[in-house]
Amino acid sequence: MRQRTIVCPLIQNDGAYLLCKMADDRGVFPGQWALSGGGVEPGERIEEALRREIREELGEQLLLTEITPWTFSDDIRTKTYADGRKEEIYMIYLTFDCVSANREVKINEEFQDYAWVKPEDLVHYDLNVATRKTLRLKGLL
């Protein structure tokens, strides 16, 4: 089984948190709301990976003013690829508290939508199990 280290930013701006709705046809949690993030490449430093994933998935304009390592977790997930293939992967999640100076987001093809969500509204979203666990641990659910 392949192992991946995943960096996940919990991005906050003016009391709201950024959630991204995964594309319906790919990823570990197709069609559900999640935190952005992705895999650390070989030889890449953790913060470099986090900033690269944010640029790739959320665009160049989103400006982070704070990045603080927060927690980690792990589990085994099945990833669905755009061509329909599936793969079981051991995932190690490194989650960071982040603050953004703006809300300028331009999502890539991994997502179909995004939202800045106040804590009291998080319960109304179809959150994937990993995001739900993270938000509970943070005291937001």
Curated annotation (Swiss-Prot):
EC assignment: the record states 3.6.1.9, 3.6.1.12, 3.6.1.-, 3.6.1.23
Task: Give start-end ranges for motif Nudix box.
Answer: 38-59
Where would I find the Nudix hydrolase domain in this sequence?
A: 1-141
Q: What class of enzyme is it?
A: hydrolase
Q: Which cofactor does it need?
A: Mg(2+)
InterPro entries, alphabetized: Nucleoside_triphosphatase_NudI (IPR023781), Nudix_hydrolase (IPR020476), NUDIX_hydrolase-like_dom_sf (IPR015797), NUDIX_hydrolase_CS (IPR020084), NUDIX_hydrolase_dom (IPR000086)
- Provide the GO MF annotations for this entry: dCTP diphosphatase activity; dTTP diphosphatase activity; dUTP diphosphatase activity; magnesium ion binding
Give UniProt keywords alphabetically.
Answer: Hydrolase, Magnesium
The protein's matches in Pfam families, at most eight in alphabetical order, are given as:
NUDIX
Q: Its catalytic activity?
A: a ribonucleoside 5'-triphosphate + H2O = a ribonucleoside 5'-phosphate + diphosphate + H(+); a 2'-deoxyribonucleoside 5'-triphosphate + H2O = a 2'-deoxyribonucleoside 5'-phosphate + diphosphate + H(+); dUTP + H2O = dUMP + diphosphate + H(+); dTTP + H2O = dTMP + diphosphate + H(+)
Q: What does this protein do?
A: Catalyzes the hydrolysis of nucleoside triphosphates, with a preference for pyrimidine deoxynucleoside triphosphates (dUTP, dTTP and dCTP).
Q: How does it assemble?
A: Monomer.
Q: Which family does it belong to?
A: Belongs to the Nudix hydrolase family. NudI subfamily.
Protein name as it appears in the record: Nucleoside triphosphatase NudI
Species assigned in the record: Escherichia coli O17:K52:H18 (strain UMN026 / ExPEC)
